[in-house]
Amino acid sequence: MNVKTSFLKNKINLKKIFREKIFTSMISIKEIDQKEFELCYELDSATICLWTKKQWQSEFYKSGTKVVAILLKKKIIGIYVVQTIIDEAQISYFSIKQKFRRKGYGSQLMTYLIKDCEKLNIKKLLLEVSETNSIAEIFYCKFNFLTVGRRKNYYKDGSDAVLKEKKFLK
């Protein structure tokens, strides 16, 4: 490799590092409250259409429930809802806006959730995913969720729910 090629390669790497540093400083993850239920409903309506507006509103009042969002430039691009009961947690909702998928935001949000579970001494984290959602299945496997069961004809389209579990070692 000549000096010019080496210089250009290093310049490109520096630009990439600088861009990533600026970009990650624009990302935040925080618990949100009932004032933002409309934004949750909008994200859900644009992605997996899981809950009605009324269901979203009620999520914020359930005991042991947290609604957490990942924000890019202070705009919500993803959400999870988790309910904790003693030493178990159930993910009842996890989604990233379509145009922000496969860019690492879901992984950042899941990592945040897992760290939160570890702080709370959760022994297992549970979720269900449609058998037709192979991308989500791969995503959850990346975080060591194992298939532990199935609910037949669970979703409106007749597909089964695949039950997943992640155990935390103490």
Predicted features along the sequence, with ranges:
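Conserved catalytic-core motifs of GNAT/GCN5-like acyltransferases
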Residues: 7, 128, 141-162
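Positions that flank functional sites
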Residues: 59, 132, 155
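Short secondary-structure boundary/hinge segments and terminal tails
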Residues: 92, 118, 135, 157-158
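Short Asp/Glu-rich motifs
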Residues: 63, 136-137, 159-160
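Terminal substrate-recognition subdomain of acyl/acetyltransferases
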Residues: 2-24, 160-170
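Acetyl-CoA-dependent GNAT
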Residues: 23, 27, 31-99, 110-112, ...
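Conserved glycine-rich acetyl-CoA-binding loop
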Residues: 97-111, 120, 124, 130-138, ...
